[in-house]
Amino acid sequence: MKYDLIIIGSGSVGAAAGYYATRAGLKVLMTDAHMPPHQQGSHHGDTRLIRHAYGEGEKYVPLVLRAQTLWDELSTHNEEPIFVRSGVVNLGPADSAFLANVARSAQQWQLNVERLDATALMTRWPEIRVPDNYIGLFEADSGFLRSELAITTWLRLAREAGCAQLFNSPVSHIHHDDNGVTIETSEGSYHASKALISAGTWVKALVPELPVQPVRKVFAWFKADGRYSTKNRFPAFTGEMPNGDQYYGFPAENDELKIGKHNGGQLIQAPEERKPFAAVASDGAEAFPFLRNVLPGIGGCLHGAACTYDNSPDEDFIIDTLPGHENTLVITGLSGHGFKFAPVLGEIAADFALGKTPSFDLTPFRLSRFSQ
């Protein structure tokens, strides 16, 4: 059997692509080296932020707004919502370049973002402490996503729509010819007109020339109480320290507040190098500088987890066809800020398989930028 689209890697982007392409009427085969959702990629740990006024650059805003529409639609397929509109407050020094980008994105796209000085911040959320020179940019319409629930939902919907799924079966080779793409797996060979490579951190095992660097990251849950929950209107947050370190976190659930550090981490070259949480001496203390200064009421570390970022050289996404192979789309280099975009990236992949022109300007995400 020849498929219209084979998906290599069915985590966040691959799961979304499998659903949207199958829903569009294509014959799709989803593959994964493991059984998604799983612990080997970048999507586990229950929750991920979604921000609209994007500090990483205005080029992402149209993508994230489309993603939000798709998240809202996906949430209708579950009793438990996938998107929780908790609001997100972005904290940092008033002269922060990241916050300047947030403000610029909000202004250009007329987004609902409120600027709060330090006094107003601490009045609204007495649990938060910041220096006098800090501000907060509060996005009331943003919030967080239930990442593993999202992937489970896409996989179920794709399967119900007739998508073939081959999991726990790593792809060992990809072959291109005039008739399309052939993959080799432990279960045999499969052929399609087009392929999506969304293999995440270890994409270089299949495409060695891609400029992607795996980075071991950790996040952890700390003892909290009801003051830090959505019931008390406590928001999700990003926070920049005076030294430039970037943190992110979520409202407490079951008296546990999850937080992680966006920058830093350990460069790794193989999956076995991603040691479990607490294997690196600094893991449990990584969030202390932020918690001590900004959330001093939070208690000790309860447990944590390790994940992996697939960093591109400029930490912007890679969305492009492989050089010399226009029938193969690669989406990688999401650099630790990609999950919120998963549905729109999946939709872009489905449009690629359908032969449609992308609805977005993807020029900033082309591979050619690294050779200029």
Curated annotation (Swiss-Prot):
Alphabetic keyword roster: FAD, Flavoprotein, Oxidoreductase
Residues at which FAD binds: 4-34
Cofactor(s) in the UniProt record: FAD
Self-association and partners: Monomer.
MF terms in GO: flavin adenine dinucleotide binding; N-methyl-L-amino-acid oxidase activity; sarcosine oxidase activity
UniProt family annotation: Belongs to the MSOX/MTOX family. MTOX subfamily.
Flavoprotein in keyword set: yes
Name of the featured protein: N-methyl-L-tryptophan oxidase
Enzyme Commission number(s) from the entry: 1.5.3.-
Enzyme class: oxidoreductase
Reactions it catalyzes: N(alpha)-methyl-L-tryptophan + O2 + H2O = L-tryptophan + formaldehyde + H2O2
Function field: Catalyzes the oxidative demethylation of N-methyl-L-tryptophan.
TM spans (from-to): none
Keyword Flavoprotein annotated: yes
Cofactor: record remark: Binds 1 FAD per subunit.
InterPro entries xrefs: FAD-dep_OxRdtase, FAD/NAD-bd_sf, Me_Trp_Oxase_MTOX, MTOX
GO cellular component, one term: cytosol
Modified-residue entries (S-8alpha-FAD cysteine), positions: 307
